[in-house]
Regions:
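Sequence-level detector for tyrosine residue identity
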Residues: 16, 28, 37-39, 140-141, ...
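Extracellular serine-dependent O-acyl
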Residues: 1-13, 28-37
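Generic recognition of stable, solvent-exposed alpha-helical segments in well-folded globular domains
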Residues: 21, 25-30, 128
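Structured core elements
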Residues: 6-8, 61, 119
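Generic structural motif
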Residues: 4, 50-53, 111
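Active-site rim elements
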Residues: 13-23
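C-terminal beta-sandwich/jelly-roll accessory domains of carbohydrate-active enzymes
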Residues: 67-164
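Surface beta-strand/loop "capping" patches
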Residues: 25, 32, 36-80
């Protein structure tokens, strides 16, 4: 669709109220979007959005796109990020192998940021073979991952690209 743009309000939501009390940040982000896309102003209006996940050795590299120079995490650990691995689940009645996917734990404090890439150190270690990463994909979430433009990262889900 033309002239349809998305903003992130994930950092101002409330668990039990669909109408967030803090409306100013949402209005500000809508205004940024209008300035950029309707009036052609050079403003940073796009929130970080996950575009790819690559396994490199035991690390996972999550690449973001958007109007920012770098990412930042508010706090010591990344919130609302889930990693999933596929594993063997047996065979079906025809003898065909089946797989299942389950969430795996990782150290949310063991990360590094290089520009617009979030690197989860050792997330793919210890027998884990991460197949998918999901961010802010629960019914309610509180994000703490932002772009240097001050906008919160958008929810995303990405399959992991081949291991290098």
């Amino acid at each position: 669709m033309e002239k349809v743009h998305l903003i992130s309000s994930s950092d101002v939501g409330m668990r039990y109220d669909i109408h967030p009390k803090r409306k100013q940040p949402i209005g500000y982000r809508l205004a940024l979007s209008a300035l950029k896309y309707e009036y052609g102003k050079a403003v940073q209006a796009d929130a970080p959005r996950g575009i790819s996940v690559r396994a490199i050795g035991s690390d996972l590299h999550i690449e973001f796109a958007g109007d920012m120079e770098t990412l930042k995490v508010c706090g010591e650990e990344i919130k609302e990020l889930q990693l999933f691995a596929r594993g063997f689940a047996g065979v079906d009645s025809r003898g065909i192998p089946m797989t299942r996917e389950q969430e795996v734990s990782f150290d949310a404090k063991d990360f590094n940021i290089e520009g617009t890439t979030l690197i989860l150190r050792n997330a793919n270690a210890g027998g884990n073979r991460i197949s998918r990463a999901a961010f802010a994909k629960k019914d309610y979430y509180e994000v703490n991952l932002y772009g240097s433009n001050g906008l919160p990262a958008m929810p995303f889900e990405c399959e992991v690209e081949k291991t290098i």
